[in-house]
Curated annotation (Swiss-Prot):
Changing residue 355 to A: Almost loss of activity. Changing residue 140 to A: Loss of activity. The gene is tiaS. It comes from the Archaea. InterPro entries: NA-bd_OB_tRNA (IPR004365), TiaS (IPR053434), TiaS-like_TCKD (IPR053870), TiaS_FLD (IPR013696), tRNA_Ile2__agm2C_synt (IPR024913), Zn_ribbon_TiaS (IPR055394). Changing residue 164 to A: Decrease in activity. Gene3D superfamilies: 2.40.50.1010, 3.30.70.2200, 3.90.600.20. It is found in: Cytoplasm. It comes from Archaeoglobus fulgidus (strain ATCC 49558 / DSM 4304 / JCM 9628 / NBRC 100126 / VC-16). The lineage of its organism: Archaea, Methanobacteriati, Methanobacteriota, Archaeoglobi, Archaeoglobales. PANTHER family: TRNA(ILE2) 2-AGMATINYLCYTIDINE SYNTHETASE TIAS. This is tRNA(Ile2) 2-agmatinylcytidine synthetase TiaS. Its main location: cytoplasm. It is an enzyme of class 6 (ligase).
């Protein structure tokens, strides 16, 4: 029989990675029980959830086995051996879903990616469909485990994750930084968001004590294998390609889908600038827009680097569409579309038609005159200010991009101002 296995919340800030644990489980299945079908899936969930470990990702994979009970036992053994169970914030969960049942979990998965779920909701679904499951400690991982099985990917990308040898876990990673930039130069945009040229950073290598050496994102298996062959690193213990919802904007809720805004959700909102950008201590930039929901504060925080310079050019009356997550009643910007620029006019003293110099005031209520030619004029001139900003899409650099946020290179839109 064919069964989807979903696993989540096995890691902590001190180590482990659910993708790595899933790979270990897949290897056990292949050795002892049956076979794994296709690539595993890495499904990123709501990025604003406060109790996430790092990227809030859950894993699922499809297997063909004779005995589900034996499958449950093997996965449980892997979790007990490798999950960070001694961390109070780690609460693993795993589910075992018949392949034909998986489609019924789509509504739950959609909510896990866009909304906020409680463990009771996961337990209700498990009870409704009599789903075999594993629940360690609080079992919060059951939410992600179900979502990883039920998510339907109309759009998807791939990620090749290379893992370190266990004896190297927690030590400094060894790699040739230049080789990653060379790889990107050669393969972009078939691979993407692996380096940040603007800020000279390799972004596909974590700085946590987890088993991951690097995770290269791309659009095809062929491109990922080429990338793997071209980068220079310490020896790789094992590797796996995951099908994922990275870079899809799957977390965004359109303004037409809701009647009110809530914290810990991500939105796409259109509005008109009502309060011009201002900086606060720390280099964060804020502005406000008027939307169908009322006034909404938006922010480009310091890690977005050059993107803040775009935001600083906004002016009152500009029409924009913002993309980002809401926390503390503020949209944390991931990208922005400048839909329409407001016309800005200034009044200046007229120019002398004879000599081309700017005229001076002739006195209160007496108009203007040229000091040299004595030419006179009655009124000031209204001049349109040339805006530095252009309509189109602007995005944060790769080093500040969230897993789910779709980079402009993957968007078929006009006026893309790509940070690479």
């Amino acid at each position: 029989m064919r069964v989807w296995v979903g696993i989540d919340d096995t890691d902590s800030s001190r180590g482990m990675c659910t993708t790595y644990l899933a790979v270990l489980a897949m290897e056990r299945v292949e050795r002892e029980l049956g076979k794994v079908i296709g690539f595993p899936r890495l499904i990123r969930l709501n990025p604003t959830i406060p109790y996430k470990t790092r990227g809030n990702g859950a894993v699922s994979f499809l297997v063909e086995v004779d005995d589900v009970g034996e499958l449950v036992d093997v996965v449980n053994e892997v979790i007990i051996e490798h999950a960070m169970l001694d961390d109070e914030k780690t609460n693993p969960g795993a589910v075992f879903v018949d392949e034909e049942l998986a489609v019924k979990l789509k509504p739950f998965a959609d909510k896990a990616i866009k909304d906020v779920l409680q463990i009771d909701e996961a337990l209700f679904v498990i009870g409704k469909y009599f789903i075999p499951h594993l629940r360690h400690k609080k079992g919060r991982g059951l939410i992600g485990a179900l979502a990883a099985v039920g998510a339907e990917l109309e759009d998807f990308t791939l990620e090749l994750i290379a893992y370190r040898y266990p004896e190297r876990f927690g030590t400094e990673r060894e790699y040739d930084e230049e080789s990653f930039f060379d790889m990107d130069y050669e393969l972009y945009p078939q691979t993407f968001d692996n380096v940040d040229w603007c800020n000279d950073v390799v972004v596909c290598i974590p700085n946590t004590p987890c088993p991951v050496l690097y995770g290269i994102r791309g659009e095809s298996v062929e491109a990922l294998y080429k990338a793997m062959e071209s980068v220079k690193t310490e020896p790789v213990d094992r590797r796996m390609i995951f099908v994922t919802n990275h870079a899809t904007d799957m977390h965004l809720i359109g303004e037409e889908e809701v009647h009110r805004l809530e914290n810990y959700r991500s939105y796409r909102l259109r509005g008109r600038v009502t309060l011009e950008p201002y900086d606060i201590e720390g280099g964060h930039v804020f502005f406000e827009i008027d939307t169908k929901f009322g006034s909404v504060k938006c922010a480009a925080f310091e890690p977005t680097k050059q993107f803040r310079n775009v935001i600083r050019l906004l002016r009152k009356g500009d029409v924009v569409e913002v993309y980002g997550s809401m926390k503390k009643d503020t949209i944390n910007l991931e990208k922005i579309q400048i839909v329409e620029l407001a016309e800005i006019w200034v009044e200046k003293n007229p120019i002398c038609p004879s000599c081309g110099r700017r005229m001076e005031s002739a006195g209160r209520g007496q108009g203007f005159r040229c000091k040299k030619c004595r030419t006179k004029a009655d009124e000031k001139l209204r001049e349109k200010v040339e805006r530095e900003l252009q309509p189109g899409f602007y995005e944060v650099p790769p080093s500040a991009r969230r897993h789910l946020s779709k980079p402009l290179i993957r968007m078929n839109v006009e006026g893309r101002h790509i940070f690479r």
